[in-house]
Amino acid sequence: MSRVQLALNVDDVDEAVVFYSKLFGVEPAKRRPGYANFAVEEPALKLVLIENRGAGGTLNHLGVEVASTGEVAAATGRLADESIATRQEDGVTCCYALQDKVWVNDPSGAPWEIYTVLADAPGTSIKGDAACCTDGAAAGAACC
Protein backbone atom coordinates (compact mmCIF):
# COMPACT_ATOMS: atom_id res chain seq x y z
CA MET A 1 0.00 0.00 0.00
CA SER A 2 1.34 3.43 -0.96
CA ARG A 3 0.61 6.46 1.18
CA VAL A 4 1.81 10.00 1.61
CA GLN A 5 3.94 10.61 4.70
CA LEU A 6 3.97 13.87 6.58
CA ALA A 7 6.47 14.35 9.39
CA LEU A 8 5.50 17.20 11.66
CA ASN A 9 7.33 18.92 14.49
CA VAL A 10 5.01 19.36 17.48
CA ASP A 11 5.48 21.21 20.75
CA ASP A 12 3.79 18.51 22.85
CA VAL A 13 3.47 15.02 21.38
CA ASP A 14 0.83 13.93 23.93
CA GLU A 15 -1.41 16.89 23.07
CA ALA A 16 -0.84 16.31 19.35
CA VAL A 17 -1.73 12.60 19.65
CA VAL A 18 -5.07 13.51 21.25
CA PHE A 19 -5.82 16.00 18.44
CA TYR A 20 -4.80 13.76 15.53
CA SER A 21 -6.64 10.76 16.99
CA LYS A 22 -9.79 12.89 16.90
CA LEU A 23 -9.05 14.45 13.50
CA PHE A 24 -8.53 11.12 11.71
CA GLY A 25 -10.58 8.83 13.96
CA VAL A 26 -7.68 6.42 14.62
CA GLU A 27 -5.15 5.78 17.36
CA PRO A 28 -1.37 5.88 16.78
CA ALA A 29 0.19 2.83 15.11
CA LYS A 30 3.42 3.43 17.05
CA ARG A 31 4.05 5.48 20.19
CA ARG A 32 7.43 6.20 21.79
CA PRO A 33 8.68 8.99 24.08
CA GLY A 34 8.56 12.17 21.99
CA TYR A 35 7.33 10.26 18.93
CA ALA A 36 4.14 8.89 17.42
CA ASN A 37 2.99 7.77 14.00
CA PHE A 38 -0.43 7.11 12.54
CA ALA A 39 -1.26 4.77 9.65
CA VAL A 40 -4.47 6.35 8.39
CA GLU A 41 -6.37 4.25 5.85
CA GLU A 42 -8.69 6.95 4.51
CA PRO A 43 -7.16 9.11 3.22
CA ALA A 44 -4.04 6.97 2.79
CA LEU A 45 -1.58 8.82 5.01
CA LYS A 46 1.39 8.09 7.23
CA LEU A 47 1.54 10.88 9.79
CA VAL A 48 4.67 11.14 11.92
CA LEU A 49 4.78 13.40 14.98
CA ILE A 50 8.17 14.38 16.39
CA GLU A 51 8.31 16.38 19.61
CA ASN A 52 10.50 19.42 19.00
CA ARG A 53 9.45 22.11 21.46
CA GLY A 54 9.51 25.57 19.98
CA ALA A 55 9.41 24.31 16.38
CA GLY A 56 5.79 23.12 16.30
CA GLY A 57 3.29 24.53 13.83
CA THR A 58 5.88 25.78 11.36
CA LEU A 59 4.21 24.57 8.14
CA ASN A 60 2.09 26.77 5.91
CA HIS A 61 -0.76 24.27 5.99
CA LEU A 62 -1.71 20.72 5.24
CA GLY A 63 -4.72 19.35 3.44
CA VAL A 64 -6.90 16.41 2.62
CA GLU A 65 -8.81 16.45 -0.66
CA VAL A 66 -12.12 14.58 -0.58
CA ALA A 67 -14.53 13.70 -3.38
CA SER A 68 -17.58 15.77 -2.44
CA THR A 69 -19.11 18.61 -0.44
CA GLY A 70 -20.99 15.93 1.49
CA GLU A 71 -17.68 14.53 2.71
CA VAL A 72 -16.57 18.02 3.77
CA ALA A 73 -19.86 18.42 5.67
CA ALA A 74 -19.48 15.00 7.30
CA ALA A 75 -15.95 15.87 8.42
CA THR A 76 -17.17 19.21 9.76
CA GLY A 77 -19.85 17.45 11.81
CA ARG A 78 -17.47 14.83 13.13
CA LEU A 79 -14.93 17.46 14.18
CA ALA A 80 -17.64 19.50 15.91
CA ASP A 81 -18.70 16.34 17.75
CA GLU A 82 -15.08 16.04 18.94
CA SER A 83 -15.16 19.70 20.14
CA ILE A 84 -12.54 20.75 17.61
CA ALA A 85 -12.96 24.36 16.48
CA THR A 86 -13.60 24.63 12.73
CA ARG A 87 -13.82 27.40 10.15
CA GLN A 88 -15.97 26.50 7.15
CA GLU A 89 -15.59 28.10 3.72
CA ASP A 90 -18.11 27.33 1.00
CA GLY A 91 -17.70 28.32 -2.63
CA VAL A 92 -14.28 29.95 -2.19
CA THR A 93 -11.78 30.36 -4.99
CA CYS A 94 -8.29 29.20 -4.11
CA CYS A 95 -5.41 27.97 -6.26
CA TYR A 96 -7.37 28.26 -9.49
CA ALA A 97 -10.26 26.17 -8.16
CA LEU A 98 -13.69 26.73 -6.68
CA GLN A 99 -13.75 24.81 -3.39
CA ASP A 100 -15.81 23.94 -0.33
CA LYS A 101 -13.63 23.38 2.72
CA VAL A 102 -13.31 23.31 6.47
CA TRP A 103 -10.23 24.43 8.39
CA VAL A 104 -8.89 23.27 11.77
CA ASN A 105 -5.66 24.01 13.62
CA ASP A 106 -3.70 21.40 15.54
CA PRO A 107 -2.51 22.12 19.10
CA SER A 108 0.75 23.60 17.77
CA GLY A 109 -1.08 25.87 15.31
CA ALA A 110 -0.54 24.00 12.03
CA PRO A 111 -3.57 24.66 9.81
CA TRP A 112 -5.33 21.76 8.07
CA GLU A 113 -7.99 21.96 5.39
CA ILE A 114 -10.43 19.27 4.35
CA TYR A 115 -11.67 20.31 0.93
CA THR A 116 -13.31 19.36 -2.33
CA VAL A 117 -12.76 20.96 -5.72
CA LEU A 118 -16.05 21.96 -7.32
CA ALA A 119 -14.73 23.44 -10.57
CA ASP A 120 -11.76 25.13 -12.18
CA ALA A 121 -11.50 28.89 -11.64
CA PRO A 122 -9.65 31.56 -13.60
CA GLY A 123 -7.66 32.93 -10.64
CA THR A 124 -6.15 32.16 -7.28
CA SER A 125 -8.73 33.98 -5.16
CA ILE A 126 -11.78 36.18 -5.47
CA LYS A 127 -11.20 39.78 -4.34
CA GLY A 128 -11.90 40.02 -0.63
CA ASP A 129 -10.95 36.41 0.14
CA ALA A 130 -8.13 35.64 2.55
CA ALA A 131 -4.72 35.57 0.91
CA CYS A 132 -4.59 32.41 -1.13
CA CYS A 133 -1.61 31.31 -3.14
CA THR A 134 -0.28 34.88 -3.10
CA ASP A 135 2.58 36.68 -1.39
CA GLY A 136 0.15 37.26 1.49
CA ALA A 137 0.36 33.56 2.25
CA ALA A 138 3.99 33.99 3.20
CA ALA A 139 2.93 36.43 5.91
CA GLY A 140 1.14 33.64 7.74
CA ALA A 141 -2.18 33.24 5.94
CA ALA A 142 -3.01 29.69 5.06
CA CYS A 143 -2.98 28.90 1.38
CA CYS A 144 -4.38 26.01 -0.56
Give the residues covered by each predicted segment.
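N-terminal beta-strand motif that seeds the catalytic metal site of vicinal oxygen chelate
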Residues: 1-14, 44, 61-62, 124-144
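Core segments of cupin and vicinal oxygen chelate
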Residues: 2-46
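Short acidic/glycine-enriched loop/turn segments that link adjacent beta-strands
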Residues: 32-35, 56, 95-100
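Conserved beta-strand in the GNAT
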Residues: 46-50, 113
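Residue-level structural signal for beta-strand termini and adjacent loop
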Residues: 51-52, 117
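A conserved beta-turn-beta hairpin within the catalytic core of GNAT-like acetyltransferases
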Residues: 55-58, 123
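Vicinal oxygen chelate
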Residues: 63-111, 119-122
